[in-house]
């Protein structure tokens, strides 16, 4: 069974020492969903939201979140990200927005938390911009889709039912 890497022998939380690790290309993808009423979704699609371009704002918020992950999650390392991509798409059949993020770097630690932070904050931004119109939007699921690089190898999530 795998050990928790952020807990030392005394059971105390600590930041992992990555100084001896080799630099490798690492990439992670994550997704999040925001489900809403059809009229709320139409307002976003038609560009009629009073606060402006919801997708552009959510995209920038996601990028900022990835770059700020180390400030939000206590034991994350500050990373020199080489790529942050936030893609938003409409799923009208499910009355929701799908957010997919991709983070990449060449470094000593993975970018899973950065990808998840980007997806989460983009979803929260959509909620924030639309809450005056609809307060019962649902955020989720939020999950890691894939990661590559590093000692633990590759990971690919299964399909969500």
Curated annotation (Swiss-Prot):
One of its GO terms (biological process) is Mo-molybdopterin cofactor biosynthetic process. It holds the Pfam family MoaC. InterPro entries: MoaC, MoaC_bact/euk, MoaC_sf, MoCo_biosynth_MoaA/MoaC, Mopterin_CF_biosynth-C_dom. Pathway: Cofactor biosynthesis; molybdopterin biosynthesis. It catalyses: (8S)-3',8-cyclo-7,8-dihydroguanosine 5'-triphosphate = cyclic pyranopterin phosphate + diphosphate. The active site is at residue 128. Transmembrane segments: none annotated. Keywords: Lyase, Molybdenum cofactor biosynthesis. Its EC number is 4.6.1.17. Substrate binds at residues 75-77, 113-114. GO terms for molecular function: cyclic pyranopterin monophosphate synthase activity. Belongs to the MoaC family. Homohexamer; trimer of dimers. Catalyzes the conversion of (8S)-3',8-cyclo-7,8-dihydroguanosine 5'-triphosphate to cyclic pyranopterin monophosphate (cPMP). This is Cyclic pyranopterin monophosphate synthase. The lineage of its organism: Bacteria, Pseudomonadati, Pseudomonadota, Gammaproteobacteria, Enterobacterales. The gene is moaC.
């Amino acid at each position: 069974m795998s050990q928790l890497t952020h807990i030392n022998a005394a059971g105390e939380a600590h930041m992992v020492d990555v100084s001896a690790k080799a630099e490798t290309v690492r990439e992670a993808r994550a997704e999040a969903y925001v489900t809403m009423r059809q009229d709320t979704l139409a307002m976003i699609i038609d560009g009629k939201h009073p606060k402006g371009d919801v997708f552009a704002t959510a995209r920038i918020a996601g990028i900022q979140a990835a770059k700020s992950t180390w400030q939000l999650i206590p034991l994350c390392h500050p990373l020199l990200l080489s790529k942050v991509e936030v893609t938003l798409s409409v799923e009208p059949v499910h009355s929701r927005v799908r957010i997919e993020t991709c983070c990449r770097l060449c470094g000593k630690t993975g970018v899973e938390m950065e990808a998840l932070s980007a997806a989460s904050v983009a979803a929260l931004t959509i909620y924030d911009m639309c809450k005056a119109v609809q307060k019962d939007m649902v955020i989720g699921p939020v999950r890691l889709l894939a990661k590559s690089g590093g000692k633990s190898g590759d990971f690919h999530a299964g399909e969500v039912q």
